[in-house]
């Protein structure tokens, strides 16, 4: 999960700094979702503060452990 969270953070950085996206929904497996959202200062919250983005994490059982979908506010994919 260390490599996975770095990969996710790099994509968030790319989307916010290069494309100017302000709202991102991450669709991930339930295990990854709980890892990203656990604790008071979770990774999700730290990334939201660091990149000034509204970040929502949604658990999706149909995805594999390392699959991540980046969606905008309307549910359209940000990265193909």
Spans of model-derived segments:
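DE-rich acidic low-complexity regions and acidic surface loops
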Residues: 1-80
């Amino acid at each position: 999960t260390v490599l996975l969270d770095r990969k996710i953070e790099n994509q968030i950085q790319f989307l916010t700094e290069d494309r100017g996206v302000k709202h991102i929904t991450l669709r991930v497996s339930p295990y990854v979702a709980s890892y990203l959202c656990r604790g008071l200062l979770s990774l999700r919250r730290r990334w939201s503060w660091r990149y000034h983005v509204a970040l929502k994490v949604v658990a999706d059982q149909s995805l594999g452990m390392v699959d991540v979908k980046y969606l905008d506010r309307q549910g359209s994919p940000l990265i193909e």
